[in-house]
Amino acid sequence: NFLEMLKENCKLLWKRQKQKFRIPMPESLCQILKKKKQ
């Protein structure tokens, strides 16, 4: 499922960002990311 993959990618991406910058995962930004890829 492509959408599920996108969701997982989003999560992984933010996990990486969190480790880099030590910031909480912004859900809204995740949504924007998904919209851009659609």
From Swiss-Prot:
Keywords: Amidation, Secreted, Toxin. GO terms for cellular component: extracellular region. It comes from the Eukaryota. It is found in: Secreted. GO terms for molecular function: toxin activity. The modification Glutamine amide is found at Q19, Q38. Expressed by the venom gland. Its main location: secreted. Belongs to the cationic peptide 04 (cupiennin) family. 10 (double chain) subfamily. This is Toxin CSTX-16. It comes from Cupiennius salei.
